[in-house]
């Protein structure tokens, strides 16, 4: 897999979402991919490429916060450990939320929940390389066209604790055992998925990513438009 260089964009190339303008749904976008030291981050990068966007990969330890607004999307990768141990991850969420459409995957999803006031709980049983059924519990364009329920790949030992979820976050998908598999902010273009869309165990992963990349960034109707 070829290296993906981090290329800070100039303000003149900033996202039109920041000015309130609308993109055509299939327009190419520059996506800041925040690498939380996950061994399969390049699979996520490849999904972004396949969706017609240009990925710009940077370590979670080195994200220049003042350039986040210059991108059209911010994608938080999975990674080991807990969100609070992942460099500037919390700061990235705080900076991007409300400015740039934001999607967190696994660890990134957990970081979003924590920044907005939620907590995590450790699972009694680790899910590593496990295919699980996932059911949609709130309309979200991310999951448009997928079977109901749909299958996802899980690689985690922590989940967002439903009992601590703040009112500003809405659950959009659950596993069969009731674990939060996806959530979104009620008023901001911020969403997260606990499962791995880049995994071979998630057959609809590319569809989910394409919906996110092609959405116009409207808060109503979910992160997928």
Where are these regions (language model features)?
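Phosphate-binding/catalytic loops
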Residues: 20, 149, 187, 192-203
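Short, charged N-terminal beta->alpha structural module
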Residues: 29-51
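Cysteine-nucleophile active-site neighborhood
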Residues: 30, 71-144, 209
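Structural signature of beta-strand start/N-cap positions in the alpha/beta core
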Residues: 30, 54, 72-73, 101-103, ...
């Amino acid at each position: 897999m070829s290296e993906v260089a981090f290329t800070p964009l100039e303000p003149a190339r900033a996202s039109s979402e920041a000015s309130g303008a609308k993109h055509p749904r299939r327009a190419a976008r520059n996506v800041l991919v925040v690498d939380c030291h996950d061994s399969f981050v390049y699979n996520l990068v490849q999904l972004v490429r396949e969706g017609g966007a240009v990925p710009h990969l940077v370590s979670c330890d080195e994200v220049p916060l003042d350039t986040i607004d210059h991108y059209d999307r911010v994608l938080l990768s999975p990674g080991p450990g807990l969100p609070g141990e992942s460099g500037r991850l919390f700061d990235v969420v705080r900076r991007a939320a409300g400015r740039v459409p934001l999607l967190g995957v696994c660890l990134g999803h957990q970081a979003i929940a924590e920044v907005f006031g939620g907590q995590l709980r450790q699972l009694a049983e680790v899910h590593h390389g496990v295919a699980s059924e996932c059911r949609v519990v709130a309309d979200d364009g991310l999951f448009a066209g997928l079977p109901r329920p749909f299958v996802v790949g899980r690689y985690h030992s922590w989940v967002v604790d439903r009992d601590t979820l703040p009112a500003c976050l809405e659950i959009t998908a659950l596993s069969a055992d009731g674990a939060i598999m996806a959530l979104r902010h009620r008023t901001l273009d911020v969403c997260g998925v606990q499962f791995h869309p880049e995994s071979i165990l998630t057959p609809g992963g590319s569809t989910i990513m394409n919906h996110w990349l092609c959405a116009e960034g409207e808060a109503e109707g979910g992160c997928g438009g």
